[in-house]
Regions:
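Extended, H/D-rich, highly charged conserved domains that either
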Residues: 108-267
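Gly/serine-rich nucleotide phosphate-binding loop at the start of the catalytic core
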Residues: 1-139, 143, 166-169, 174-177, ...
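A conditional alpha-helix N-cap/helix-loop micro-motif detector
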Residues: 89, 268-269
């Protein structure tokens, strides 16, 4: 495809992107083996429940929380990996904002749909302060509520001196696996300002030692992922020290996130 053909499609077609977890690298981890671990664990828990499985479940959730969810906290964001990831998202927004501004068609809106399976807040963070319209589907200021009708709106800009009206580019962000800052309230999805607080508190109460570490640490300091069998063995050892019910509060708070957890069942969800 040459530049002329590409220009034609940009000018005359609806523009949609689908981005996955790799877009938030290197700052946030990809799923790795977590999806396979949770899928197998869910199958075992469905066929016959044992306390060790609850401990393993909590441990895998914590590993996912530590690597993908917790780094989105405001005070956590720093370092070269964060800067690189944020810059990549900003380049995406700047480039397409410029292209949409140059769209000549009056039939098509100056909108771009970004569908993402990511539950993180990196693209929202990147857009903050850029002067770019990122529509995440929420309406309202004090207690924003998610409303899909929001994606059908256009934003117009009027010149102060000549009363000339023009449409400005809008990026619609559709998070098809949910988001870590979504919460349920009165049958609505609302913004949760303190999304990490309650899970963090449960982890502090329990301590890291009550969770199975999903990695083996070699003598050289290198980490290798544990197998499913090794994780279950670790859960069996913890079962001798702690009651499985002690993990209930953490699991309950974690499951309040309105997200599709990384298992093969996510395709059904």
């Amino acid at each position: 495809m040459n530049i002329k053909e590409l220009t034609y499609y940009i000018q005359s077609a609806n523009i949609n992107f689908l981005i996955g977890s790799g877009a938030s690298r290197p700052y946030l981890a990809t799923l790795g083996s977590i999806e396979k671990l949770l899928t197998r664990l869910n199958d075992d828990m469905t066929s016959h429940f044992e306390p060790k499985y609850k401990i393993a479940e909590a441990s895998i959730y914590k590993a996912f929380y530590d690597s993908v969810i917790a780094p989105n906290r405001l005070y956590h964001k720093s370092g070269d990996d964060y800067s690189e990831t944020k810059k990549n998202y900003q380049n995406y927004l700047i480039t397409w904002n410029s292209l949409l501004n140059k769209r000549h068609s009056r039939i098509l809106k100056k909108q771009l749909n970004t569908f993402t399976t990511n539950i993180d807040l990196m693209i929202e963070d990147a857009a903050n302060g850029m002067g770019i319209e990122l529509n995440d589907g929420f309406r309202g200021s004090i207690n924003p509520i998610y409303d899909e009708a929001n994606f059908m709106k256009s934003i117009m800009q009027t010149s102060i001196h000549f009363q000339h009206t023009s449409e400005i580019p809008v990026f619609n962000l559709l998070k098809i696996h949910g988001s870590i800052n979504w919460s349920g309230y009165n049958n609505h999805i609302v913004h949760e300002r303190f999304w990490s607080y309650y899970v963090d508190e449960e982890i502090k109460k329990m301590g890291d030692d009550r969770f199975v570490n999903l990695f083996n640490i070699g003598s050289d300091g290198r980490k290798t992922e544990k197998t499913y069998e090794q994780i279950i063995e670790g859960a069996e050892e913890l079962e001798l020290l702690y009651e499985a019910s002690e993990y209930d509060a953490f699991i309950t708070e974690y499951k309040k996130f309105i997200i599709v957890n990384p298992t093969k069942r996510k395709f059904a969800e």
